[in-house]
């Protein structure tokens, strides 16, 4: 499992703990920051860059890429470019908690918690207890 900043990393932690509590299965988890691979940096602004943490070689491994919300698909495309700079996985699957539509690239999640159609001027945020002291999906 590989989380994308910011909430994708926290979501990866939550999912890893839940998977272990239900199955006893431990999975390796990591993080990948797509910032340097984005094609829209001037539009999304700047933020603190997080170092990638890929704990194992990814060659011929199945990778579950995790993010909180999918919108245009640009973050996922950039994250996949960053991931492939570490090697060539056998398969990459995508898990998101919320799909709000409005894709600009042909990228679709393999696993989606909820589809929440929004207008382009609205935004959605995922809040998690371990970070935000509240839990839910919020339309803003």
For the regions a protein language model found, what residue spans apply to each?
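PRPP-associated nucleotide enzymes
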Residues: 1-140
């Amino acid at each position: 499992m590989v989380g994308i900043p910011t909430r994708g990393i926290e979501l990866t932690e939550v999912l890893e703990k839940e998977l272990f509590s239900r199955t006893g299965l431990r999975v390796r988890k990591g993080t990948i920051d797509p910032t340097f691979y984005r094609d829209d940096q001037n539009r999304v602004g700047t933020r603190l860059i997080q170092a990638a943490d890929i704990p194992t070689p990814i060659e011929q491994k199945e990778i579950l890429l995790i993010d909180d919300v999918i919108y245009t698909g640009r973050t996922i495309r950039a994250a996949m470019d960053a991931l492939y700079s570490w090697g060539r996985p056998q398969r990459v699957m995508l898990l998101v908690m919320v799909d709000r539509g409005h894709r600009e690239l042909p990228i679709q999640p393999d696993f989606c918690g909820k589809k929440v159609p929004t207008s382009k001027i609205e935004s959605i945020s995922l809040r998690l207890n371990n970070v935000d002291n509240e839990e839910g999906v919020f339309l803003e």
